[in-house]
């Protein structure tokens, strides 16, 4: 018998019950005791094994994006962008690449309702011929903060109060009153699109600025955008209360049931690009994650489509153990100096090692589907069977070599070490433009949500005045409406 063929898998189920080590179990209902009513014996290894496994079924919850749902499918190139990227999976129209996607809420726990006002995660893992590519984003194209130094600090006030375990507006408004860069994100979150109807009817965005490199080594900054073919749909407060009150997993069920019924969700992938040589001509910093790139001067360019046509087989293996990291890229795609992206490159891999162990990339959902080889050996939960004698590099006994060189961005860095903010902050222009683009009733709902938040009894007069000042700088009439509703005199 080949012992490596029969690895743990549902494909090799025995016709009878066994222990984890494969020994047959003739009674899975009764403990081993001294007589029919005596104490249980410690030697009842089967009972001990069952209890020990049950006690360890749960792994650490994701610190953010704990609540989520996954599905599998494919990405197909529809437009040639080889002038921008030499990535193999983008090499020609018609090329298909397997993907797995995880949608999520951000702030609350694993069992929380999917109808809360919260950003949604939109993470895609491409299983390419040159390794995996993780595009880890959200449904909104911007973020709360622009520097990773603030990342942990911005999560804590959004999380429940550590004393009461209740999410409270005063904590959120207090923290972000120190960070007016968050205004643009709040113009999305407090808008009508703040509660997506479900995962199928929402946009996706790479959020951060990446870099595309072509075969000649020419680099372009890039933003990635997913657009659902079935359109964007959202829930207003009354609908969210109704839907969430009847099914707290409505978005997960909608995704699963739609795919099971053959109603496969589909998204188109678009990109925006900027030549780094010309970035100074814009009134925003392309590396500022709190800004969008205006589509009238930087139009969306179609790239491909993604279809989710298969449900996952096991929620734990393909959702809870599924791990994404923005550091996982392929030739033709690279990072930028986006300060938030630079932080995520480290943090995401680090949290996966904490949550799943140092060999998390060996788990089937995370492992590449292409051939791969290195000398990363051993460690906790290393289940890869390896029989080589040479576990070092280079060696004359091992033909393994370096891969062919591929282009990298030709960046030259110089400057003194310092901690500073970007020059082109411009925190108020874009949220003001968004607000003015809405219909009057949509504007009124936005105002009402802010009035409700600022009416928290623990929000001080100072904090209330700061937010009215911020929104007045974005749009004077918006600030005046807030001041009128709250009986606060605007400061500008």
From Swiss-Prot:
InterPro entries: Catalase, Catalase_AS, Catalase_clade1/3, Catalase_core, Catalase_haem_BS, Catalase_immune_responsive, Catalase_sf
Chief place where the protein resides: other
Catalysed transformations (reactions): 2 H2O2 = O2 + 2 H2O
Cellular component annotations (GO), alphabetically ordered: glyoxysome; plasma membrane
UniProt-annotated location(s): Glyoxysome
Binding site for heme: 348
Highest taxon of the lineage: Eukaryota
Pfam family, one: Catalase
Protein purpose: Occurs in almost all aerobically respiring organisms and serves to protect cells from the toxic effects of hydrogen peroxide.
Identification of the protein by name: Catalase isozyme 1
Organism name: Cucurbita pepo
Gene name, Swiss-Prot/TrEMBL: CAT1
